Amino acid sequence: MDYQTTNSEPFYSAGQKQQHCWEPGEKAEYKRLRAQLGSSWAYYEYEELITCTNRLGYRSTTVVPPTVGDYFIMCGCSNVFGQYLHEWHRASNRVEKATGVPVINLGICGGGANIIAMNMQKLWFSNYPKPRAIIVQWPSIHRMAFPSEDVECRLIHIDIARENSGGVQETHASEYLLRHEGVYENQAHHAFHMVNSLEVPVINFAILSYIAEFYDIPRVRFVSAQDDRARDNLHCGRLMNKQIYKHIMKELNTV
């Protein structure tokens, strides 16, 4: 079998090429939020939001590292992916526009620290050019994602939140791992130190305080405004992505 560790792609597959306007079950939730938040809500007037993923399942126009010129990589969870948000509002798109340097967005919905490290390790063992810098929004510590050869499910997630909402019920993997002290913490630290040892500049940040404290990295805070949330009223919105963009640009000026 042509396992993903040996194939010619620079990154693990996170899904399939697809295009959609709504996440599963989102239409009903949108109607509820519209009624709850009223006409001052940024998404009160419906504006088509198309999410397109490339052949590796990432929401990124640049799929593989360019053979000529610099490029950046931006890793993280659904907040980097830009779930429930128009592409042009994402921090990665803003960085690309401001610098003229392509940004490969490797945001994975439900992704954990381990898959960030695995993707970087896969790239480093390939013949592809390496990035000018890696930008990482470190996700929840108590979460992991593993590449699969199943074409219908390219990533297997171990996440207590998913299990509580009906996922991976047959294993209860997160509950099992949580009973063993340090399992999540050790893998998260290992992933962090591996990525930060690749001899290219790494811009680290977190959105939540406990993650920033765990890794001892900067925290980019939510802006106190309703417009700060995406269409689900949970994920990072337009203003928050501007904050992230400003943090990244400030750090890029020092590397």
Located regions from the model:
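N-terminal secretory targeting modules
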Residues: 1-73, 129-132, 138-180, 206-216, ...
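Serine-esterase "nucleophile elbow" of acetyl-processing enzymes
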Residues: 53-119
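Surface-exposed cleft-lining segments at the edges of enzyme active sites
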Residues: 78-83, 108-109, 168-187, 229-233
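A structural motif corresponding to the C-terminal end of an alpha-helix
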Residues: 98-100, 186-205, 210-213
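A structural signal for short, well-ordered beta-strand segments and their strand-loop junctions
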Residues: 102-107, 133-137, 201-207
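Well-ordered, non-membrane alpha-helical segments in soluble/globular domains
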Residues: 117-121, 180-195
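Short, well-structured alpha-helical segments in soluble
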Residues: 118-130
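Histidine-centered active-site loop/cap adjacent to the catalytic His
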Residues: 228-255
